[in-house]
């Protein structure tokens, strides 16, 4: 019996003890548990990845909707600004035309007043000159009759 034999016997005993203690089953159970844990972690990672993809898709959709809404708001604001500008332009043009018409009316009234004033003064001067001429050349009775007739004529023409 040499040392190799005893080494073989010790090995067989050791393997027997391992089998008796169910070490291969524990190793298999430990490996199975580890494999199950890895499988669960992979499943969890897959689930988290799908959830992240769904969230990403949802956020991208919301971003597109927000961009579209912002674009619509900008377009609406531009249309509103154009309407306000055109409305202000129309109102300004109307205001200017009203002010121009009012100024033209005032000018026309001033012209009429000036013409009437000139006519009135011309009539007054003509009447005074005619009265003076008549007073110098005509006697009192004829002058008085002529003066009355002239005054009557002027009154009818002015009215």
From Swiss-Prot:
Entry keyword set: ATP synthesis, Cell inner membrane, Cell membrane, CF(0), Hydrogen ion transport, Ion transport, Membrane, Transmembrane, Transmembrane helix, Transport
UniProt GO cellular component terms: plasma membrane; proton-transporting ATP synthase complex
InterPro entries, per database record: ATP_synth_b/b'su_bac/chlpt (IPR002146), ATP_synthase_B_chain (IPR050059)
GO molecular-function terms, A-Z: proton-transporting ATP synthase activity, rotational mechanism; proton-transporting ATPase activity, rotational mechanism
Cell location: Cell inner membrane
Membrane topology: Single-pass membrane protein
Database matches in CDD domains: ATP-synt_Fo_b
Transmembrane portions of the chain: 1-21
Superkingdom field: Bacteria
NCBIfam families: PRK09173.1
Function: F(1)F(0) ATP synthase produces ATP from ADP in the presence of a proton or sodium gradient. F-type ATPases consist of two structural domains, F(1) containing the extramembraneous catalytic core and F(0) containing the membrane proton channel, linked together by a central stalk and a peripheral stalk. During catalysis, ATP synthesis in the catalytic domain of F(1) is coupled via a rotary mechanism of the central stalk subunits to proton translocation.
Family that this chain belongs to: Belongs to the ATPase B chain family.
Subunit structure: F-type ATPases have 2 components, F(1) - the catalytic core - and F(0) - the membrane proton channel. F(1) has five subunits: alpha(3), beta(3), gamma(1), delta(1), epsilon(1). F(0) has three main subunits: a(1), b(2) and c(10-14). The alpha and beta chains form an alternating ring which encloses part of the gamma chain. F(1) is attached to F(0) by a central stalk formed by the gamma and epsilon chains, while a peripheral stalk is formed by the delta and b chains.
Protein name (record): ATP synthase subunit b 2
Organism: Chelativorans sp. (strain BNC1)
């Amino acid at each position: 019996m040499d040392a190799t034999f005893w080494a073989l016997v010790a090995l067989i005993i050791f393997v027997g003890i391992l089998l008796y203690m169910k070490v291969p089953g524990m190793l298999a159970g430990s490996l199975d548990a580890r494999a199950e844990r890895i499988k669960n972690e992979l499943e969890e990672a897959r689930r988290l990845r799908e959830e992240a993809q769904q969230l990403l898709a949802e956020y991208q959709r919301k971003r597109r909707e927000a961009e579209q809404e912002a674009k619509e708001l900008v377009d609406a604001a531009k249309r509103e600004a154009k309407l306000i500008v055109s409305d202000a332009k129309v109102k300004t043009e109307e205001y200017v035309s009203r002010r121009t018409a009012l100024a033209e009316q005032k000018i026309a009234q001033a012209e009429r007043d000036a013409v009437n004033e000139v006519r009135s003064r011309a009539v007054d001067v003509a009447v005074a000159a005619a009265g003076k001429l008549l007073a110098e050349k005509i006697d009192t009775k004829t002058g008085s009759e002529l003066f009355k007739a002239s005054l009557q004529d002027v009154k009818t023409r002015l009215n």
